[in-house]
Amino acid sequence: MKTLLLTLVVVTIVCLDLGYTLKCNKLVPLFYKTCPAGKNLCYKMFMVATPKVPVKRGCIDVCPKSSLLVKYVCCNTDRCN
């Protein structure tokens, strides 16, 4: 009986994500990655001249400043980029 209870506890811990992990889209939005610890923002980078076509997506710790040529959009919810 103790073995069964211990097994259920272990399976529950393995199946549940006990710590919150952010998921961000990769360049192709069908695919995503789980962000490592400390990277708590998703970002999308694109050229100002072609704002509809993202150049890069992923996880980041601090949102970079946009420039005249490159724009960054950052967010902090799952797959928001």
UniProtKB/Swiss-Prot annotation:
Monomer in solution; Homodimer and oligomer in the presence of negatively charged lipids forming a pore with a size ranging between 20 and 30 Angstroms. Interacts with Kv channel-interacting protein 1 (KCNIP1) in a calcium-independent manner. GO terms for molecular function: toxin activity. Belongs to the three-finger toxin family. Short-chain subfamily. Type IA cytotoxin sub-subfamily. GO terms for cellular component: extracellular region; membrane; other organism cell membrane. Keywords: Cardiotoxin, Cytolysis, Disulfide bond, Hemolysis, Membrane, Secreted, Signal, Target cell membrane, Target membrane, Toxin. It comes from the Eukaryota. InterPro entries: Cytotoxin_Cobra, Snake_3FTx, Snake_toxin-like_sf, Snake_toxin_con_site, Toxin_cobra-type. Pfam families: Toxin_cobra-type. Basic protein that binds to cell membrane and depolarizes cardiomyocytes. This cytotoxin also possesses lytic activity on many other cells, including red blood cells. Interaction with sulfatides in the cell membrane induces pore formation and cell internalization. Cytotoxicity is due to pore formation, and to another mechanism independent of membrane-damaging activity. When internalized, it targets the mitochondrial membrane and induces mitochondrial swelling and fragmentation. It inhibits protein kinases C. It binds to the integrin alpha-V/beta-3 (ITGAV/ITGB3) with a moderate affinity. Residues 1-21 form the signal peptide. Expressed by the venom gland. The keyword Secreted applies. The keyword Disulfide bond applies. It is found in: Secreted; Target cell membrane. One of its GO terms (biological process) is killing of cells of another organism. Disulfide bonds join C24-C42, C35-C59, C63-C74, C75-C80. This is Cytotoxin 3.
